[in-house]
Amino acid sequence: MPLHNLTRFPRLEFIGAPTPLEYLPRFSDYLGREIFIKRDDVTPMAMGGNKLRKLEFLAADALREGADTLITAGAIQSNHVRQTAAVAAKLGLHCVALLENPIGTTAENYLTNGNRLLLDLFNTQIEMCDALTDPNAQLEELATRVEAQGFRPYVIPVGGSNALGALGYVESALEIAQQCEGAVNISSVVVASGSAGTHAGLAVGLEHLLPESELIGVTVSRSVADQLPKVVNLQQAIAKELELTASAEILLWDDYFAPGYGVPNDEGMEAVKLLARFEGILLDPVYTGKAMAGLIDGISQKRFKDEGPILFIHTGGAPALFAYHPHV
């Protein structure tokens, strides 16, 4: 795989050493299957998470363009917005965040705690909207207003999920392959599939590095019919950037996100509690809890291609636990 093409893209080193890839002995015994976990929840900044991999590329591009302001969008409890705001603070940039309330709650805890609390600590300028119905257009409109105020904005899409940001997860696939070499033959990889950049980047990288491993994206907000084109389009855009072929089938499970994005469900919360009690690792109610619910049920329903070891990609999100009390 010509990963040397990755070096063509400016990148800031926020993460440093590879994040741990760990065996989960007690959880494995409970499920009757070897379960490993990639700990992207412990990336260095702002309580960790997967978006920092994307921001290494996106923030480097922003600096290259001479930007002094990062603009992005998400839910009030967005992990991506939190990490973008932290990166802006570290780089001495202004950050403007366009936020929506996707679950329509008036609960004070959701509106002020968790990720939202951290945005204030990072001195983020908050702009509220009724809904992110067309986030790309809404971000461009916000950037125009910010530019009129004399700033030099750089727009980062929802989730940092464009071809440039998703290169962070092609890089992650290389890291995973190196960590598994001579240690474990991973049969299946499970990841939450939302804004699609993490899923698509892994799809491109793992196709070339661990071609015998199946990659399952557990959707957190959309049906397979709606999510599939998002992942495929990004997969092909990444491959074009890297001058690679990308022909791996995109596999999605959409049985675990109901009743909707950002709304906890019983299966997801049970997964959060199980991993906390067996391994002392914190998942979240929005992304990783639902993805882990898919992994657990997938074993029970024999949905995986075989009974080999499974790798769970922990994308972070624990700060949201505080916002979702008393559901937790």
From Swiss-Prot:
Q: Which keywords does this chain's UniProt record carry?
A: Lyase, Pyridoxal phosphate
For this protein, the record's InterPro entries field holds: ACCD_DCysDesulf, D-Cys_desShydrase, D_Cys_desulphydr_bac, TrpB-like_PALP, TrpB-like_PALP_sf
Q: Say if the entry is tagged with keyword Lyase.
A: yes
Q: Name one GO molecular function term.
A: D-cysteine desulfhydrase activity
Catalytic activity entry:
D-cysteine + H2O = hydrogen sulfide + pyruvate + NH4(+) + H(+)
Domain of life of the native organism: Bacteria
| Primary enzyme class | lyase
Annotated signal sequence is none
EC identifiers of the protein: 4.4.1.15
According to its UniProt entry, the protein's GO biological process terms are: D-amino acid metabolic process
Q: Which cofactor is essential here?
A: pyridoxal 5'-phosphate
Question: Which positions bear N6-(pyridoxal phosphate)lysine?
Answer: K51
Q: Name the PANTHER family for this protein.
A: 1-AMINOCYCLOPROPANE-1-CARBOXYLATE DEAMINASE-RELATED
Complex and partners: Homodimer.
UniProt family annotation: Belongs to the ACC deaminase/D-cysteine desulfhydrase family.
**Functional summary from the UniProt entry:** Catalyzes the alpha,beta-elimination reaction of D-cysteine and of several D-cysteine derivatives. It could be a defense mechanism against D-cysteine.
Q: What is this protein called in UniProt?
A: D-cysteine desulfhydrase
Q: Which organism is it from?
A: Escherichia coli O9:H4 (strain HS)
